[in-house]
Amino acid sequence: MAKAVGIDLGTTNSVIAVLEGGKPVVLENAEGERVTPSVVAFRDGETLVGRMAKRQAVLNPEGTIFEIKRFIGRRFEEVQEEAKRVPYKVVPGPDGGVRVEVKGKLYTPEEISAMILRKLVEDASKKLGEKITKAVITVPAYFNNAQREATANAGRIAGLEVLRIINEPTAAALAYGLDKKGNETVLVFDLGGGTFDVTVLEIGEGVFEVKATSGDTHLGGSDMDHAIVNWLAEEFKKEHGVDLKADRQALQRLIEAAEKAKIELSSTLETTISLPFIALDPASKTPLHLEKKLTRAKFEELIQPLLKRLRGPVEQALKDAGLTPAQIDEVILVGGATRVPAVQQVVRELLGKEPNRSVNPDEVVAMGAAIQAGVLMGEVRDVVLLDVTPLSLGVETKGGVMTVLIPRNTTIPTRKCEIFTTAEHNQTAVEIHVLQGERPMAQDNKSLGRFRLEGIPPMPAGVPQIEVCFDIDANGILHVTAKERSTGREASITIQNTTTLSEEEIQRIIEEAKRHAEEDRRRREHAELKNALDSARVQAERVLQERQGAPEARARLEAAIGKAKELVERDAPDPELKAATEELLKAVEEYEKGAQAASGKGPDDVIDADYKPAD
């Protein structure tokens, strides 16, 4: 049976895991790393993903895309702050969604995410020796409907059957609690690169029940990096009058240096940020260098506003679960940003206990997703996962009010129906406006979509009975139906936010991805053929130097070597490269045979002598 994998598609890094013998195992990528940077770069007609993409970011800031998770499933008007912080171009799409522009070509966040997924899956397939087609993909618990749908679409574009979209903290709890025997109430504190989630669960006898979840999709480790970036840029501007953030290459260097400093300050009390030749003096045109000492105390001062924002979701999750900090048995830290000592201190202050460090914060989410994949594939038994919807869902009613049908923290899957009526006499159609959020007025909440129910018989206001049903599936994705009871007329909508892709767009992107995959495969094959010919040439040259063969064979081999050199330099087509490699290997073989024959002619060439030990 084909394997299904678990994928943590992260803001800064991504991880893929699989079940081996009932235990989740993280799979290394082609570079031998367990964690793959969530970075995609477009350079000279080729697409780089992961470490290779991250490495060349400073030289190619406009063509290197990172933190794409901050843009997925969002409207352009919602991401103005995030768009200013990245060196690449973020532009509005025709649907009001987000697009990334590289050299005049527009990419959706789903396409970029699919490239990361494809890299993870292709590398894992090679590692396992079998093609992977099924996956469970994780998302922040606080992702809304549009963001979940967009993530599922990214999986489809990558050629995957997405078995389930599950919440990151829930996945982490699965990995933590799989072998636990007793009952525990745990709080998962998940601070990743770009999102923050707090989830309270009860774990016992294979049942993982989410009691409450809260969070902030605009808060993570990269916000800490940007706090350092802003400080460095301000200090440099004060000193030299140059705005480094206006230069895309300088901004990329600042971002990388800030991330490095943040990581170092988790284990040391101070670090030096050194960026030589960061800019030119506007007056003298001489190079300017940035050299700045950053202490842990200063770093904690810079991120103080972010640390304060961690408190609200923790308190909200506890309140919604009806628990006090003393009733929490374990606090599980998830996400790389939880390594920051000041973050751990906030956890201690809020919950009055030392956090549990038994899980790897970078890998535990993917491992939990692999367990859920095993559950769905029937490999893991006696595990039941009961998750919740993170935000309330409802419809707009008279006066612009949001009427809630499904309150936040309702266990999913779930179905809820309510009866509504018309506001005007002889109204023959109603518009159902579906909303997600916690504010009382419709305009203050997230609009998920609108649809019309037509053909209502003319009746006085308040007489028609319109049944509106909300259905949330196990992925947390919403389906809404409206039915007029007297006629049985029905209308429905699978909520696709205007920022998510239509089926036609998804199919177009899938086809494009397949074409690119074919191009990539051809490019790789071509490179391998060139390398094979070049390696054969090097081997042939060594044989010429080390062995003495017949003059005619030598001339043939030298000619084949010369031809190989010329074809590699000319970047010849594949058939020529293949033929030249075969020709060269044959010439080497013939030359070596001749050389062996010459060296082993028998008695005339061999001097017989007794063996005498040296004195």
From Swiss-Prot:
Region of interest called Disordered, as start-end residue ranges on this chain: 592-615
Print the keywords alphabetically. Answer: ATP-binding, Chaperone, Nucleotide-binding, Phosphoprotein, Stress response
Q: Please provide an example of a Pfam family that matches this protein in its UniProt record.
A: HSP70
SUPFAM superfamilies tied to this protein: Actin-like ATPase domain (SSF53067), Heat shock protein 70kD (HSP70), peptide-binding domain (SSF100920)
Induction annotation: By stress conditions e.g. heat shock.
Q: Name one GO molecular function term.
A: ATP binding
Reply yes or no: does the keyword ATP-binding apply. yes
Modified-residue entries (Phosphothreonine), positions: 195
Annotated family:
Belongs to the heat shock protein 70 family.
What does the function comment of this entry state?
Answer: Acts as a chaperone.
Name this polypeptide is given: Chaperone protein DnaK
Q: What is the lineage of its organism?
A: Bacteria, Thermotogati, Deinococcota, Deinococci, Thermales
Q: Which gene encodes it?
A: dnaK
